[in-house]
Amino acid sequence: MDIDIDKLDFQLDWPIIGRLKDEFYPYEGYDHIRYTARGLIENSRGQFVFLHIEGEDLFGMRDHLETCGGGLEENEAVDDALIREVREELGHEVHGLELIGSIVDTYNLIHRITLSTFFHGYIDDRDIPMHRTEEEEILIKEIVCLDPLAALDRLEHQAVHAVDKLVQRRDALALRCYLKYKGLL
């Protein structure tokens, strides 16, 4: 089965803010769609919080920033998925969720189309226990907090490996959209 990204209609009640095609790995068709929730999470100092991912996996070497988030579990609402992911990956409660929109992107190496729905939200300084997966424990090097424009610059201009570019361009698109909406660009 091959799915055409340009013909997909997800029938969402919110906008698709971008469609990004994988230009880094050979195209061999797509056989599944993954639905994710992702967060532009802001701390009490007005900085955006990212996961610094470092290591090696199927995609090769990685060293990139990534928004908090992940796949929806069965029968899970997209906002509930983000609340869960923030707890698991950052060890914080998130509040004030504001829907930004969705990005459709492709991952040729794993034959996947992903619909990532982005929210903006806030965390406070109170920690709660994290519950990272084994893979997250290995790949998440640290939590990085950056001012909005520094975050955008790093996402857009500091990616070395192909997978870094795939991930950071998605997150940069969401951040740029949010900052424009807020009049900060």
Enumerate the language-model features and the residues they cover.
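Short connector loops at helix/strand junctions that flank enzyme active sites
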Residues: 34, 62-67, 94, 114-116
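Short, charged/polar surface micro-motifs in flexible loops or helix N-caps
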Residues: 42-48, 56, 73, 120-128
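Conserved Nudix-box catalytic region and its N-terminal flanking loop in Nudix hydrolases
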Residues: 47-88
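A short coil-to-beta-strand element that immediately follows conserved catalytic motifs
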Residues: 93-101
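Active-site-adjacent beta-strand/loop module that shapes the phosphate/pyrophosphate-binding cleft
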Residues: 105-130, 144
